[in-house]
């Protein structure tokens, strides 16, 4: 395990695109692109907590969540930032994670409470997944307990959502119009609370776990196939590199949700772990080099 870069903020949403790892630095309000030598380019400055993003097909730019605007924004290849979809009619709270499949279906989820203020007392309102397109969005799955990382299988047939508060990965069939059906438990993960996820060519999923400071590879049904233990919280993971056989993990020491807005001494790190089975599906499939 090697550190690609250290000394950043709270990192999330790793994506492999055009030979570089792109990450959202939540505390700095930046999207950064990091090459294999550790050189960093700041791609966008945007204050949002959470802030996650993914890439549209065919060089269509990227789409990012904006919590303050309760919207999805689009960053075009020429650097223009515009509104992609208004999400304010779906919830009084801002969106969380986003994934875009190979057909351009844009799925965005919402934990349905004020993330920056921390979890509410008692049982929070259930979260949901919405399908967004330019100018519109509609809920396609609800009753999700803190929906977090999402991934789509390589055949564009299945969306997998990490339900952090139910300690499971939940799957849906994707219809021709992008709608979701046939909800099912894809994997129970014990007492872990899965955060960011990605998929590999064997059909297994990697998930990051904050509290247990690890990344775990599981197959459908929940069998644990591999585990990478860290010295700090793991927030998300991405299979990248030229052969997609590097597991990139974004990690930092976690001060707890109650201290998120006040913590200043972040030690955000991107770790690189070689693996045998390459990545597949989305995010990340066919994203250039």
Language model features with spans:
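Short loop/turn segments immediately following beta-strands, especially the blade-tip
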Residues: 172-179, 275-280
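A short beta-strand motif characteristic of beta-propeller blades
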Residues: 1-5, 38-45, 81-88, 136-142, ...
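Short loop/turn segments immediately following the C-termini of beta-strands
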Residues: 26, 67-68, 111-113, 164, ...
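A short loop-to-beta-strand structural motif that recurs across blades of beta-propeller domains
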Residues: 30-32, 71-73, 127-130, 168-170, ...
């Amino acid at each position: 395990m090697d550190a690609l870069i250290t000394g950043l903020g709270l990192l999330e949403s790793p994506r492999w695109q055009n030979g570089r790892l792109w990450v959202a630095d939540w505390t700095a309000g930046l999207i950064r692109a990091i090459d294999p030598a550790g050189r960093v380019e700041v791609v966008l400055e945007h204050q949002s907590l959470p802030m996650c993003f993914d890439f549209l097909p065919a060089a269509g730019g990227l789409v990012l969540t904006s919590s303050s605007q309760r919207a999805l924004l689009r960053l075009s290849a020429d650097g223009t930032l515009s509104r992609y979809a208004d999400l304010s009619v779906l919830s009084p709270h801002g969106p969380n994670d986003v994934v875009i499949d190979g057909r351009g279906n844009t799925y965005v989820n919402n934990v349905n409470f004020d993330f920056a203020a921390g979890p509410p007392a008692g049982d929070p309102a259930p979260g949901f997944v919405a399908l967004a397109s330019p100018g519109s969005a509609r809920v396609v799955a609800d009753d999700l307990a803190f929906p977090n990382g999402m991934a789509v299988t390589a055949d564009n047939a299945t969306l997998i959502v990490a339900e952090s508060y139910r300690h499971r990965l939940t799957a849906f069939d994707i219809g021709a119009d992008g709608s979701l059906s046939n909800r099912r438990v894809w994997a129970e993960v014990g007492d872990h609370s899965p955060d960011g996820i990605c998929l590999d060519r064997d059909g297994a999923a990697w998930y990051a776990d904050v509290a247990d400071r690890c990344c775990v590879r599981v197959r459908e049904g929940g069998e644990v196939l591999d585990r990478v233990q860290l010295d700090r919280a793991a927030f998300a993971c991405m299979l990248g590199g030229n052969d997609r056989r590097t597991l990139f993990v974004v990690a930092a020491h976690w001060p707890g949700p109650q201290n998120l807005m006040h913590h200043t001494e972040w030690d955000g790190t991107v770790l690189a772990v070689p693996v045998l089975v390459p990545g597949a599906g989305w995010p990340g499939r066919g994203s250039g080099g």
